[in-house]
């Protein structure tokens, strides 16, 4: 009776899958280990079954005027066997910027659908017509946007993929916080869940982005909070208990569909499955890991989630999406996290940062600003590195890097130098310049 009825669940241990295998005479150990989050053991070797790549793929962007109609359309769209069915609610569209992504002002929700085919484009176009017929029954903000080639499909996915890191731009103090981020309800009730969540957070005066895999009834809920502020902290705790409680009692859902329990949701595993089944989980854990050395405190724990909060980390501006790494010329050469924009951000903002310990990586940045250009959160890693370089223990280097960090002044000096370059290149001025600069450059070069 405690078996989750939703389409996917990663809460607790999958004893139901294990039992199903035993009923067929198969001890399906992967069913138990997959989703156990490293708490039961380590898989040292695995055989994977590969599936062929689809011959064709289409992506469709659909804007609905009414949120409730999205939920009504889902069962019909699922008959087309979509490989992806993503939803973004009105709040989310507002937060990421409608105009930046061409989203109509009157869209209550946007649906992103993707279909794969092993039979080629003809099959895809036929199913695209079926999709248009299904969506034509509802109030849409214009026609469906359908793309077949990769470049156009990537453009349609752009808003969805940039969604989470873009939320970091919203407020310098309030950041997207994940603590009720993975609930699952029956797919037919996803619109009802979204409406409930919008009403709840509106009452709390908390901005929130709600998006997720609507075909599975899986919602990713991301409130924007400053957990170092007492009022926001209290709102987070209240939302944690009220939303998880409502998902279990009102929606007959699961507290996590794919992200796992971890430490954040561990205290709710007992509430979801009941005492008898929870004690069975405990027995499984104790049997396979009697010394409790495999990820202790994960899944099986009574510790409140607030005990595990890294307050400093949650106040940082980086979303760790690694888009910056894709354009970083240093990372392109070294292919190492400590030689990348994302890695540098973690290094220079660490509590135990030391210039001498980090000198090699801090001075590797070319300050090309590519990271700032592509970052959805607007983080300028190169600027942070310039500030750290100005802390160089060598006085000469510190002065030079401090000057470089003051971009308007530094750029003015470079402009003046460029204009007088032809004069300094003459033999006599050049010799004087080299004689004056040599002691300074030697002192800097020793660092």
Model-derived regions, located:
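A short, ordered amphipathic alpha-helix with a cationic face
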Residues: 121, 255, 334, 357-362
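Ferredoxin-like iron-sulfur electron-transfer modules
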Residues: 302-320, 348-367
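Non-catalytic, well-ordered alpha-helical scaffold segments
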Residues: 71, 107-110, 342-346, 359, ...
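Active-site-adjacent beta-strand anchor residues
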Residues: 63, 338, 374
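Noncatalytic alpha-helical scaffold of FAD-dependent oxidoreductases
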Residues: 1-257, 261-303, 307-322, 327-331
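Flexible, glycine-rich loop/tail regions that form catalytic "lids" or insertion modules at the edges
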Residues: 332-345, 349
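Iron-sulfur-cluster electron-transfer modules
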Residues: 171-174, 350-447
